[in-house]
Amino acid sequence: MDSNHQSNYKLSKTEKKLLRKQIKARHTLLRHEGIETVSYATQSLIVANGGLGNQVSRNQLLPVLEKCGLVDALLMPPNKPYSCVRYKTVEESKTAYDTLNGKEIVDDLGQKIILYLNFVEKAQWKELGLQALPPGLKVIEEIISSEDEKMLLESVNWTEDTENQNFQKSLKHRRVKHFGYEFHYENNNVDKDKPLPGGLPDICESILEKWLKEGFIKHKPDQLTINQYEPGHGIPAHIDTHSAFEDEIISLSLGSEIVMDFKHPDGMTVPVMLPCRSLLVMTGESRYLWTHGITPRKFDTVQASKGHKSGIITSDVEDLTLNKRGIRTSFTFRKVRQTPCNCSYPLVCDSQMKETPASFPESDKEALQLEQDYVHRVYEEIARHFSSTRHTPWPHIVEFLKALPSGSLVADIGCGNGKYLGINNELYMIGCDHSQNLVDICRERQYQAFVCDALAVPIRSGSCDACISIAVIHHFATAERRVAALQELVRLLRPGGKALIYVWAMEQEYNKKKSKYLRENRTSQGMKEEISNDASVQELLVKQLPNVGNQDSAHSVSSINDFQDGGCNSKNVANSKLPIHTNRTSFHSQDLLVPWHFKGNPGKDKRVEPFGPLGSRDPGPVFHRYYHVFCEGELEAACRTLNNISILQSYYDQGNWCVILQKV
């Protein structure tokens, strides 16, 4: 809607709303992408809400655009909620602008979305150079016939008697069967002393012999895991344990194609299309050094020109579209290793890594490493699943934000998926988090967020009217670092500014009332015992934890000691390993590792607790996060070590200690 048109007559209510949406789209593009729109007509238009990130495919959008003229190019960057169309003439572009602005279409999920268009001079995206498959990786297409595929799928009896040791284990939107040895997802390993009876299915034996004879594989596997995935399910990025299996790991895709992501430790990610009836073979560097995983989603970004052919998904924005996932069944074969691994990648090899006892960090460097391994890396892995469980804002936090004056600048330090950034539209809110994947989710929701360390926030001192820190400070591994995080919050505040802080409480039963975390105990007693007494998990964590000292960091700042006279009923854990907490039970130590059970299809996992993870009966991957849970009075004591604040209020809220402080 141009300015000349606006000046001729008074805008209707609908036109005003459309104009507001257009302006918002312009600001979002400029803030997040650096794309400037213009007020005059050009050949190019940015189509807000018409992107792959909105589940709008090329095949769906292009016919709509072509009704207005000859489309010269349609650029659809991956994971972005917009696209750019270039018409042959300016007149055709103007026609599209007038016709399609505010047009409602239905995306590939059946949801209604509205398109908003703005003119641009040019739109550019960074193009990644041509990528190669990770070394040692190959994909063999059509390795079996459609008849063999049908026989393999029909051979899997998902309803057999549970007395058979090969019976399936049902996960949410996923079923699993094991042959040869049971694959343990909590440590990506097998128990070599407990082979399953019967070996591999007969139908697989003949196929494997054929692959060996034709040179597709080098070893005959003795372990098979069959997974059936519903659309929307994923696999967290991982490396199969070095000491458990030989160099070669192979996976046969049946029923549907999928895009699998391979990631190098330097951060480079290579998405690879695995067609139906193709065999993925991982050897060497691709098996030992690169992680592999599948992002949980219902649509994959693929190249329109390649269809379902194998290969790398490039960043050619003129050739990207969406491909709807189907039900995929994977047959993953491995050869169990009987000797320690002596690969060329000792830094990620459990056979070659130095075993060190787990204790508590006595230096800032060791604390930083603990946080890196058991906070930051974990949140990057579980970000999508974690986000799906964080959807309901807490009333007292909402109350705090609603009470702030209109126009206040508020920083959410450790914003996660941004669920508090849109609570009060009269505030100017910005968020930050250490996790790139969580910040990406914020941006997908059109929130302003950036990546940073909570101990060094790149915001000018004294510029914020308020700050919130929800479930962040309990992840710092020493008292000094927790106090430093509080000091950083105060630094951001103007004089008179307020901060709201939430941390997980040691006391999950308070005033004779259990917290939601305890009340909503969905784990069986058997599962509790499995988690808390699993020696193999404890041993694995001992191997991975940094070499740390024996100081109990909860007492390393003397002024925080005063609050504890008879108050905190925790065990003395100095000179001990970090204990693994049993989910949905009371805490017995202030410093501990809390399991997070990764589940499938994050969009449908409804949970109500704010900070604590949920136990699971599913044998899915388990991640462990470091926590320091706070005793009553400890948070206030830490705040009082700061010399420029006053505590306005402190309270207990569903298993969390909370403070509102003001900068003086």
UniProtKB/Swiss-Prot annotation:
Subunit architecture? Interacts with TRMT112.
Q: What does the function comment of this entry state?
A: Catalyzes the methylation of 5-carboxymethyl uridine to 5-methylcarboxymethyl uridine at the wobble position of the anticodon loop in tRNA via its methyltransferase domain. Catalyzes the last step in the formation of 5-methylcarboxymethyl uridine at the wobble position of the anticodon loop in target tRNA. Has a preference for tRNA(Arg) and tRNA(Glu), and does not bind tRNA(Lys).
**InterPro entries xref list:** AlkB-like, AlkB_hom8_N, AlkB_tRNA_MeTrf/Diox, ALKBH8_RRM, Methyltransf_11, Nucleotide-bd_a/b_plait_sf, Oxoglu/Fe-dep_dioxygenase_dom, RBD_domain_sf
Residue stretches making up the Fe2OG dioxygenase domain: 220-337
Which parts of the sequence bind 2-oxoglutarate? N227, Q228, Y229, R328, R334
**Residues where Fe cation binds:** H238, D240, H292
Would I find Iron among this entry's keywords?
yes
Q: Where does Zn(2+) bind?
A: H242, C341, C343, C349
What PROSITE patterns does UniProt report for this protein, alphabetically?
Answer: FE2OG_OXY
- This entry's Enzyme Commission designation comes to 2.1.1.229
Q: Which cofactor does it need?
A: Fe(2+)
* Protein name (record): tRNA (carboxymethyluridine(34)-5-O)-methyltransferase ALKBH8
Listed under GO biological process in this entry are: DNA damage response; tRNA methylation; tRNA wobble uridine modification
Q: Which GO terms describe its cellular component?
A: cytoplasm; cytosol; nucleus
Q: Name one GO molecular function term.
A: zinc ion binding
What is written in the cofactor note of this entry? Binds 1 Fe(2+) ion per subunit.
Q: Where in the cell is it found?
A: Cytoplasm; Nucleus
Q: Which family does it belong to?
A: Belongs to the alkB family.
What Gene3D superfamilies has UniProt attached to this entry?
A: 2.60.120.1520, 3.30.70.330, Vaccinia Virus protein VP39
Q: Which residues form the RRM domain?
A: 43-120
What residue spans carry the region label Methyltransferase domain?
Answer: 411-664
Q: Where along the sequence do coiled-coil regions lie? A: none
